[in-house]
Regions:
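Hydrophobic/aliphatic anchor position in the core parallel beta-sheet
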Residues: 71, 157, 186, 229, ...
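N-terminal accessory segments that target, anchor, or regulate ATP-driven/P-loop NTPase machines
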Residues: 1-126, 306
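Conserved AAA+ ATPase "sensor/coupling" helix adjacent to the nucleotide-binding pocket
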Residues: 113, 117, 206, 210, ...
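His-Asp phosphorelay/catalytic-motif detector in bacterial-type signaling
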Residues: 65-72, 154, 182-184, 267
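Nucleotide-binding/hydrolysis machinery
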Residues: 125, 129, 135-138, 151, ...
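Conserved post-Walker A coupling segment in P-loop NTPases
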Residues: 145-213, 223-239, 304-309
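Conserved AAA+/SF3 P-loop NTPase catalytic/coupling segment centered on the Walker-B
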Residues: 196-201, 219-253, 268-272, 278-290, ...
Length: 323
């Protein structure tokens, strides 16, 4: 199929009139359709249903290849009267759940999602060609969310995950896919490795003579990341005084160098990562609640490798070939 294409499948009863109306609406919006090959299902696809059952959930899991393929589940109005919830279908493998009310409106929604998904899959294909390993459904789903937030938003991102889950890989992918014009560099700062006495200089930079050993002026992370992305790894290790200073820069987008009196403007995308539970730290008074809400506009939890069994052999081959 050329252009935007998908398969369409009716789960349950559907009149010929309903099928004809949907087919005409899809053609009107330049969406090509094909029958579902149930022997070798591939996405994207549309499944229209009138009742949520265990068999429907099993079907969605099968045709989505356990989440690998993009499926839109469209609920006819009678399906909603049962009090069922769409999240059951999302858990089963559907990428989105829509409601069949106004047909033209729902088809416009379908087209918008298909166009966005095509863009995201192209971005992911480029990332995988550049060395990102993604075979497991759970990791593919995570990378899709990362790609979508990176390309279609400039919001701050908080990456959560155990050590070794690929937090820096995710941060670099966000920076790589960021669509800002004239985007500059990715600046990486490991908060756990910053010497407390020099933390101000690391973030804000310093003027010549600001302290013993400051023989020349030096730009800090806020200056270097201007126009680009600032990645704060292990952000949970920041001491409270520095948290307050970071919060102010995020809010005001301006700072002073250590030993300086001039305000400097900075604009950057903020990506933070940690293996700690920041909400528990907030409860204990170890992490500022206002800073947490600033850095966590979008939260991405990375699955550990034990939940990505399909990626183990490809990862081993990748590391072997690059060694």
């Amino acid at each position: 199929m050329m252009g935007i294409g998908c398969w369409v499948h009716y789960w349950g009863d559907a009149s010929e009139q309903e099928k004809s109306l949907l087919a005409k609406a899809l053609v009107k919006h330049d969406i090509e359709t094909a029958p579902l090959d149930q022997d070798r299902p591939s996405g994207p696809g549309i499944c229209i249903f009138d009742e949520i059952t265990g068999r429907l959930r099993d079907f969605l899991q099968f045709v989505s290849c356990a989440g690998r393929q993009r499926i839109i589940a469209i609920a006819k109005l009678e399906a909603l009267r049962n009090g069922e919830r769409g999240w059951e279908l999302l858990q089963a493998g559907a990428s989105d759940v829509l409601v069949w009310s106004d047909l033209d409106h729902v088809v416009r929604q379908v087209k918008a999602r298909l166009e966005r998904w095509i863009s995201i899959e192209q971005l992911l294909a480029g990332a995988c060609a550049a060395g990102v390993v993604a075979e497991s459904p759970v990791w593919l789903a995570t990378l899709r969310r990362i790609s979508e937030i990176a390309r279609f938003s400039d919001t701050s991102v908080l990456i959560l995950g155990e050590t070794g889950t690929g937090k820096e890989v995710a941060a670099r992918l966000i920076h790589q896919l960021d669509s800002r014009p004239n985007k500059r560099e990715l600046v990486v700062l490991d908060c756990s490795a910053i010497v407390s006495e020099l933390s101000g200089s690391e973030f804000f930079g310093h003027e010549r003579g600001a302290f013993t050993g400051a023989l020349s002026e030096r730009p800090g992370a806020f200056a270097l990341a201007n126009g680009g992305t600032l990645f704060l790894d292990e952000v949970g290790e920041l001491p409270l005084p520095l948290q307050a200073q970071l919060l102010r820069v995020i809010q005001e987008r301006s700072y002073k160098r250590v030993g300086g009196s001039t305000w400097h403007r900075t604009e950057f995308r903020l990506v933070c990562a940690t293996n700690r539970n920041l909400l528990e730290m907030v409860t204990r008074g170890e992490f500022r609640a206002d800073l947490f809400h600033r850095i966590a506009s979008f939260i991405c939890k990375l699955p550990p490798l034990r939940e990505r069994i399909e990626d183990i052999i490809p990862l081993a081959e990748h590391f072997f070939s690059s060694s």
